[in-house]
A protein has these predicted regions:
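Alpha-helical bundle segments that constitute or directly flank the non-heme di-iron/ferroxidase center
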Residues: 132-144
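Terminal regions of secretory-pathway proteins
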Residues: 1-133, 150-541, 545-550
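Secondary-structure-rich domain cores
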Residues: 146-148
Length: 550
């Protein structure tokens, strides 16, 4: 895998600024002597996630507010509210707003934490587009992809209505994003058994009515606060610019948290090229120093007892305790795996860990039942064909299965209740020709006569068999978009730009912020293997930063 795959998913932990509400503080105590933080620094700042009322306002466990839509629906591109979407749009030709270098628009609120930068920070559908340079790249990629498709639709149809062009381009982009996610990203992450067990890959051709209206597709706590944070172990200490002709310049990742300067003056193109070819960090229990000790390091001294930087691993474990998720062993059983009764790696113990990883867990926890999900899952030995151990594979496959089978607007649906809302067979053929390498090739500018080349399977290294570098002209096959816009344009003209539901009412969006303030997934989980088993909440009170890496 490459850094492109490591950054396809976004960071899910964000830094809390200067605290305004002490009742929400859940600081992490630092024992001294600490191998990194200087004497006198006794706590690491941590703010709890905002609580939300239980379903129907009944009494129950504390739940957390999720302000994002619970589907692969491009909310990081378009936002999760109408107000944010309006700010992100250009109001001409169905396009999204860009800055003068075809990058993300300026964030009028400035940079997070009051950071002073040479260039302005960015605004996107997600609040973290400037968090790291490698996270900014996919934001810019899909912004440009939307505008490219909107322009192509305008030329092919002659339609000038901004709303029609925007919604149609958005519809195509979301379908392509879903296709790339389930047919390139997840196969690079999970083994064949997990992909097949949860029916994650799309059909090679045609429609697929996988929608199940009895499923609750919202994000389970274990996925958001532990399993999907597995990408943090793939982060490297450096980011880079590949300027072509063997000219590569590298930078410390810790120097560019929420600093967008590397994206300007063709920096996006240089960074995208570097990400496609550089190796990622190994998927294991270790985090690099740039995010374990120097995350969001500040040159400004905070309170006397507070650290000037953060430890992402510690924050992830504390976030799991903030949400009150059960321990590692509970999720082993949830996934049909055997619980660990002792720390040895023999049957009955930590059978999916190396002796070194098991010993590190034993030094940190008193009993296997005390192991936090993030620590236990991240330290598992990857299974063959995957970069993850069985527990995180199970949870990620389970959640993405819910996202797919619980999505009424999944791109492969036939929509028997309203066929106008579905893609035609001809349109699906074009969507299923989408690859991430085509998306990337379509949006990059050629700089100084240097033409881009990428491997066809962009999320995998070019050194693997049948994945050697190819020119973008060959990848796109002479079509700037990488697919034929004609079927979409022809149908849009036939519908006269109107895509209405059967009763003349537009289909609603997937649930947005207003809905999610009232509804949230439960914190008890039903096993996909044993539907009758239920695992309740288990809470912890505090967290001591481990002296050793686990």
């Amino acid at each position: 895998m490459t850094p492109v795959s490591a950054k396809f998913s976004t960071y899910l932990t964000h830094h809390g600024q200067k605290r305004k509400y002490p009742q929400f503080c859940f600081n992490i105590r630092i024992d001294q002597p600490d191998p990194f933080f200087q004497p006198g620094k006794t706590c690491m700042h941590f703010v709890r996630h905002l609580g939300a009322p239980p379903l129907r306002c009944e009494s129950g466990v504390r739940e957390q507010l999720n302000e994002r839509t619970a589907f692969v629906d491009g909310s990081m591109i378009y936002g999760s509210t109408f107000d944010l979407e309006k700010k992100l749009r250009d109001s001409f030709g169905g396009r999204l707003a860009e800055n003068y270098e075809n990058l993300l628009p300026c964030n009028e609120k400035g940079c997070p934490r009051g950071i002073i930068t040479k260039y302005h920070c960015f605004m996107a559908g997600d609040h973290r587009p400037s968090e790291t340079p490698t996270l900014t790249v996919p934001h810019i990629t899909w912004l440009r992809r939307h505008n490219l498709i909107a322009d192509a639709l305008r030329r092919a149809t002659g339609i000038r209505n901004d709303e029609i062009l925007f919604q149609e381009a958005r519809r195509i982009v979301i379908a392509q994003l879903q296709h790339v996610t389930y047919n390139e990203f997840l196969p690079a992450l999970l083994d064949d058994f997990t992909m097949n067990y949860f029916n994650l890959q799309s059909r090679s051709s045609g429609h697929s009515d996988v929608y199940n209206d009895r499923l609750d597709p919202r994000t389970i706590n274990a996925f958001g606060v532990a399993a999907y944070r597995m990408g943090h172990s793939l982060v490297r200490n450096i980011v880079g610019h590949d300027r072509g002709f063997g000219k590569i310049q590298v930078f410390n990742v810790s120097d560019f948290f929420e600093v967008p300067d590397l994206m300007f003056k063709n920096g996006y193109e240089f960074m995208a090229r570097w990400m496609s070819r550089a190796p990622k960090s190994r998927s294991d229990r270790f985090l690099v120093n740039g995010i374990r000790n120097e995350l969001f390091k500040s040159p400004i001294e905070g309170e006397d007892s507070e650290t000037m930087s953060l430890d992402l691993g510690a924050l992830n474990i504390q976030r799991g305790r903030d949400h009150g998720i059960p321990p590692y062993n509970a999720y082993r059983e949830f996934c049909g795996l055997r619980r660990a009764r002792f720390f040895a790696t023999v049957p009955g113990g930590l059978v999916d860990h190396t002796p070194q990883a098991a010993a590190a867990l034993q030094r940190t926890y008193r009993h296997p039942d005390d192991i936090d999900l993030y620590a236990g899952g991240l330290s598992e030995t990857p299974r063959k064909g995957s970069i993850l151990g069985p527990t995180f594979q199970c949870l990620i496959g389970y959640q993405f299965g819910l996202y797919k089978h619980g999505d009424r607007f999944w791109y492969e649906r036939t929509f028997p209740e309203n066929a106008v809302a579905a893609f035609t067979q001809e349109e699906l053929v074009q969507i299923k020709r989408t690859t991430y390498s085509k998306v990337m090739c379509s949006v990059l500018k050629n700089i100084g006569g240097h033409f881009h080349s990428f491997q066809p399977r962009l999320l995998l290294r070019p050194e693997i068999e049948r994945n050697q570098l190819q020119s973008c002209n060959r990848i796109l096959r002479g079509n700037r978009l990488g697919f034929d816009i004609t079927p979409f344009a022809r149908r849009l003209l036939r519908l006269r730009g109107r895509r209405r539901a059967a009763l003349g009412v537009s289909f609603p969006r997937n649930p947005g912020t207003r809905f999610l303030r009232l509804v949230k997934p439960r914190s008890v989980f039903y096993s996909p293997i044993n539907p009758g088993r239920v695992f309740p909440i288990r809470r912890r009170i505090s967290f001591h930063r481990p002296k050793r890496t686990i």
